Amino acid sequence: MSYFVAPFEVSSKSLGAPLKVHFVHLYSAIATRHSDTIDVVFLVDGLKATVAVSCATLAELRGREGINLADQQLADIAALYLRQTLERGYEATEAELFLRGEQLRALGRELGYL
């Protein structure tokens, strides 16, 4: 499968120069990190940044609400979350960013997926 998130730049007063962000890949972290997440990996100025999307939240969306987000939609939601996080001045390459619950739903609604 092939997913595409267009490269983008993020600016923030606290970040200094604009940061260049590139999507790398999306994969299940259960096998690689023993984490119950779907990891969406980006490079932020060449440094790895991971947005970990909660599998429990995805299962809840599918089970209770009948919504099944496609991988491309997850990549888009993760990119928006990373963009917003960087715009607030957070250094996203220092730790994983966890995306779950209402936060994921809000971003999905913002993109028109929910």
List each model region and its residues.
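Short, charged/polar N-terminal "headpieces" of proteins
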Residues: M1-L47
